Swiss-Prot record:
Disulfide bonds: none annotated. The gene is Dap. InterPro entries: DAP1/DAPL1 (IPR024130). The modification Phosphoserine is found at S3, S49, S51, S91. Associates with ribosomes; inhibiting translation. Interacts with eiF5a (EIF5A and EIF5A2); inhibiting translation. This is Death-associated protein 1. The modification N6-acetyllysine is found at K29. Keywords: Acetylation, Apoptosis, Autophagy, Phosphoprotein, Translation regulation. Residues 32-43 have a biased composition (Basic and acidic residues). GO terms for biological process: apoptotic process; apoptotic signaling pathway; autophagy; negative regulation of autophagy; regulation of translation. Ribosome-binding protein involved in ribosome hibernation, a process during which ribosomes are stabilized in an inactive state and preserved from proteasomal degradation. Acts via its association with eiF5a (EIF5A and EIF5A2) at the polypeptide exit tunnel of the ribosome, preventing mRNA translation. Involved in ribosome hibernation in the mature oocyte by preventing mRNA translation, leading to ribosome inactivation. Ribosomes, which are produced in large quantities during oogenesis, are stored and translationally repressed in the oocyte and early embryo.
Length: 102
């Protein structure tokens, strides 16, 4: 098989044509050019800003103060499951499997 000349590459839709071996296409990963990366860096610097201010939360008409109103310990207690005062005793069921006689 002949390879295309190094100086001039044919492009289809802006990229070189697919390489086939045994009737199947072979994926070729090529690194991107550095031109687009420089443009992205400029855009990132322009749009860098701090996070937007947090909106004030009103609970029953009063401004909430975050952890001061609801400490983390109180939230943990609210999410814990209540424990049973007495243990449940499950009676074991015997499984009877019907099998044919010999």
């Amino acid at each position: 098989m002949s390879s295309p000349p190094e100086g001039k590459l044919e492009t289809k839709a802006g990229h070189p044509p697919a390489v086939k071996a045994g009737g199947m296409r072979i994926v070729q990963k090529h690194p991107h050019t550095g031109d687009g990366k420089e443009e992205r860096d400029k855009d990132d610097q322009e749009w860098e800003s701090t996070s937007p201010p947090k909106p004030t939360v009103f609970i029953s008409g009063v401004i909430a103060r975050g952890d001061k109103d609801f400490p983390p310990a109180a939230a943990q207690v609210a999410h814990q499951k209540p424990h049973a005062s007495m243990d449940k005793h499950v009676s074991p069921r015997t499984q009877h499997i019907q099998q044919p006689r010999k």
